[in-house]
Amino acid sequence: MKKILLTIFSFLLVFSLIGCSQKSSTKEEKVLKLGVVPSSNSEKLVDDLSPFAKALGDKLGMKVEVFTASSYIGVIEGIGSGSVDFGLVPPFSAVLSNKQSNTKNLLVGRSTSGKPGYFAEVFVRKDSNIKSLADLKGKKIAFVDPSSASGYIYAGAMLKDAGIDLDKDIQYQFSGGHDK
């Protein structure tokens, strides 16, 4: 009888320990979330950043997911709320993030020429009679985003320098990204 009880107890012990030496398959892997602003087509942007995310994830030993926000502020709010761990953002968004979300800049990019600079562009149809910024007076304009330096702040300053009052001389709206 003792042998039978010992055998049953041994089987129960063995079966209760099965899987204890293995890592749990339900354990969640740590994921680092990278937020980016909508500077081009969202799917293309994620595809373009996939090699970077994979290389970074391999180096850190964790998965890196790329998140494209619907607006510039979306990345800042994501960092502030903790739903985004870090972001690749343009200069003005970085300044806003530092002020609004108590973040800090870890890396700062540099132009390929190595020289400081920034630019904004204004596009019109080829067959348009608009030849200068002053010709935009009375027109409808699409800016990128209120938090975009090149897509609103600098472009708006260029228009003001050309004698255009943004509130009186034009109608404008925000497209939501450089790709729109």
Question: What kind of region is each of these model predictions?
Answer:
Residues S16-G19:
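C-terminal motif of bacterial Sec signal peptides marking the signal peptidase cleavage site
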Residues E29, L34-K59, A69, F92, ...:
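Bilobed "Venus flytrap"/periplasmic-binding protein-like clamshell domains
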Residues I73-G87, Q100-S101, A134, G177-K180:
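Short helices/loops that flank or line small-molecule/ion binding pockets
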Residues S97-R110:
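Ligand-binding "clamshell"
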